[in-house]
Regions:
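Acidic, metal-coordinating helix/loop segments flanking the phosphotransfer/catalytic sites
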Residues: 32-48
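Acidic catalytic/metal-coordinating carboxylates
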Residues: 35, 59-62
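Conserved acidic segment of CheY-like receiver
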Residues: 1-12, 17-21, 49
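Short amphipathic alpha-helix used as the core "switch/output" element in two-component signaling
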Residues: 61-73
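C-terminal output helix
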Residues: 86, 104-117
């Protein structure tokens, strides 16, 4: 079972995406947060963190280093809109395993989560 932390500021997206993830037999959403502050309280006990870049209280990339300090084995996928996908190197340089497009096909997102090696 891959334990997932979902950090996105849009509550409707978080709920819908969490439901999609929970339908997968090997994925479990163990925490969801809408801001950096909330995300910081949920960093332990996750295998993969899906982190949005544009959070109301800062850049989601800030959580990557904090996650690594608390949970060194966790993997990170940064979620981004299509426009932000033009510069994925920032996320990878910050320590993410990759970047996924929020609007991408759900099967591709599931494959990316599974492909992190978590």
């Amino acid at each position: 079972m891959i334990r997932v932390l979902l950090v996105d500021d849009r509550a409707d997206f978080r709920r819908a995406f969490a439901r999609l993830l929970e339908r997968q037999p090997d994925l479990e959403v163990v925490a969801a947060a809408g801001s950096l502050a909330e995300g910081r309280t949920q960093l332990s006990g996750v295998d993969v963190a899906l982190i949005d870049r544009g959070l109301p209280d800062g850049d989601g990339l800030e959580l990557i280093g904090e996650l690594r300090a608390v949970n060194p084995g966790a993997r990170v996928l940064v979620m981004s809109s299509t426009a932000e996908m033009r510069h994925p190197t920032e996320a990878v340089e910050a320590g993410a395993e990759g970047v996924i497009d929020k609007l991408d096909d759900s099967e591709r997102v599931f494959a990316a989560i599974r492909g992190t090696g978590a």
